[in-house]
Design a protein with these regions (language model features):
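Phosphate/pyrophosphate-binding loops at sites that engage ATP/ADP/AMP, CoA/4′-phosphopantetheine
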Residues: 58, 79-87, 110-128, 279-286, ...
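Glycine-/small-residue-rich "gating" segment that lines the acyl/pantetheine channel
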Residues: 45, 152-164, 205, 209, ...
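Active-site-proximal gating segment of KS-fold condensing enzymes and close homologs
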Residues: 131-191, 233, 238-240, 338-352
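Active-site-proximal alpha-helical scaffold in enzymes
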Residues: 105-119, 173-177, 184, 190-224, ...
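Condensing-enzyme catalytic core mediating Claisen C-C bond formation in acyl metabolism
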Residues: 9, 13-17, 40-45, 247-327
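Active-site nucleophile and cofactor-binding loops and adjacent substrate-binding regions
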Residues: 97-102, 123-125, 160-173, 191-199, ...
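Acyl-CoA/ACP chain-elongation machinery
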Residues: 215-260, 293-306, 330-339, 354-403
Length: 438
């Protein structure tokens, strides 16, 4: 287990002081929370101006393409408003903001700073690191680059491939991490984990390690992803993991007996981690601690997974710290193998005493590289507010998935701890344990 709490050195305990999120529900974590509490769905049928190659994709899928997308124009408008008086911020948006992954990351970061009670000027004075990842570079930039170099497209407009910073600010996967460092003048270690759908949670663990080891006092962590592209959706359809439901809002059904896959979602989640001592010295009361984490590999295959849940069980075993988890935020993709594996792992670890669990992909879509960080933001809110969220579209329990899941919101003020699970293609299996102080 990766432990981030030490009785001998309590000042090095890792606390969460702020968070922000951008999703198909809106440009803030509060909009996301309100939508989840009211059982809304962000997945919608897409119009031709929302996704490339709409006609060909619709023909291939044999239905109208659907996803939970984020409006780049609204994101940029919000960034320009929030950074109108900050010259550094304006230059960062000019250099990086033309790509949706970067712009969502920056907007989520600004919200995270606000909830942490920090201004940009204050944050720029800290000994700060930055661990922000994504599952892939900008697909739009890659596809446009390929189209141009293969002679199929020319005269691409400035702001996409024609932008002078396209190579460094879109084609390289660490662009979103570098954008955060530029905005914050962060000179501590910078990392960009790329671990498929476990990217966000791995970023949190890596940042927590930097703080607990005394390398930095503050670390920006999280991830972003914008994969509502024809190439991704066609590939997932061929893999058999994209939902074929006629009603896209009810397509993704985690742990439901009628589940048949997920819909793609876009988004970003950013958290501010600090050492407990640093947060205390600046007068900030932090009630959420990152107690520990676990990070293992399932070597079964690129997209295959061990259905017994043995690796998931091992991750949960390592997260155990003598106290039962009050709540689990599961990965819950709504695919047959993932949900079976998770359910088996939870049952092997907890036995008949399964804690309440929930998953949000039926509402948000699968955010892929952004899933772990956005879902951790939601898990923190659930723990702070004492709420077990409904698992959207969970109607008929799969008898092969022994789970403690509800389709309606439940109030549980006694929640003091939450465990978050993330799984990713390639065998990434990650867990994180959070505690709330009384």
């Amino acid at each position: 287990m990766l432990s981030f709490c030490d009785k001998k050195f309590p000042d090095r305990d890792v606390v969460v002081t702020g968070f922000g999120a951008v999703t198909g529900f809106g440009l803030s974590s509060n909009e996301l929370w309100q939508a989840l509490c009211s059982n809304q769905q962000a997945v919608r049928p897409l119009t031709p101006d929302q996704i490339d190659h709409w006609d060909a994709l619709a023909q291939y899928l044999k239905q109208v393409p659907s996803a939970a997308v984020v409006d780049q124009e609204l994101v940029l408008q919000s960034l320009h408003e929030k950074l109108s008086r900050d010259s550094i911020g304006q230059s960062v948006v000019a250099d990086f903001g033309f790509d949706l992954v970067n712009s969502m990351t920056l907007l989520a970061l600004l919200e995270a700073l606000q909830t942490a009670g920090l201004t940009l000027e204050e944050a720029r004075q800290f000994n700060m690191g930055c661990v922000v990842g994504t599952s892939k570079p900008s697909l739009r930039a890659i596809e446009d680059w390929f189209a141009m170099t293969s002679g199929r497209q020319s005269g691409l407009e400035v702001g996409r491939l024609g932008h002078e910073n396209t190579f460094g600010s879109a084609l390289l996967p660490d662009a979103c991490q570098r954008a955060c460092c530029r905005l914050l003048n962060a000179t501590g270690p910078g990392q960009c984990p790329v671990a498929a759908c476990a990217t966000g949670l791995i970023a949190v663990l890596q940042g927590a390690m930097l703080i607990h080891q005394g390398v930095v006092d503050v670390c920006v962590v999280g991830s972003a992803d914008a994969s509502a592209r024809a190439s991704v959706m066609a590939a997932f359809h061929r893999l058999g993991v994209l939902s074929r439901a006629e009603n896209p809002g009810s397509g993704c059904r985690p742990f439901d007996v009628n589940r048949d896959g997920f819909h793609v979602g876009e988004g970003a989640g950013i958290l501010i981690l600090e050492s407990a001592g640093h947060a205390s010295r600046r007068g900030h009361h932090a009630d959420v601690r990152v107690a520990g984490g676990a990070w293992l590999t399932d070597p079964t295959g690129l997209t295959q997974i061990d259905a017994t849940g043995a690796v998931v069980e091992s991750v949960l075993d390592q997260l155990e710290d003598g106290r039962l988890t009050d709540l689990c935020s599961v990965h819950g993709t709504g695919t047959i193998p993932n949900d079976q594996c998770e359910a088996n792992g939870l049952k092997r670890h907890f036995g008949a005493s399964l804690p309440p669990s929930f998953g949000i992909k039926g509402a948000t879509g699968h955010l892929l590289g952004a899933a772990g960080s956005v879902e951790l933001v939601v898990a923190i809110q659930a723990m702070q507010k004492g709420v077990v969220l409904p698992t959207t579209n969970y109607l008929d329990a799969d008898p092969q998935c022994f789970m403690n899941i509800e389709s309606q919101l439940r109030v549980r003020p006694e929640i003091r701890s939450v465990s978050k699970l993330s799984l990713g293609f390639g065998g990434h299996v990650v867990g994180c344990r959070l505690h709330r102080e009384s």
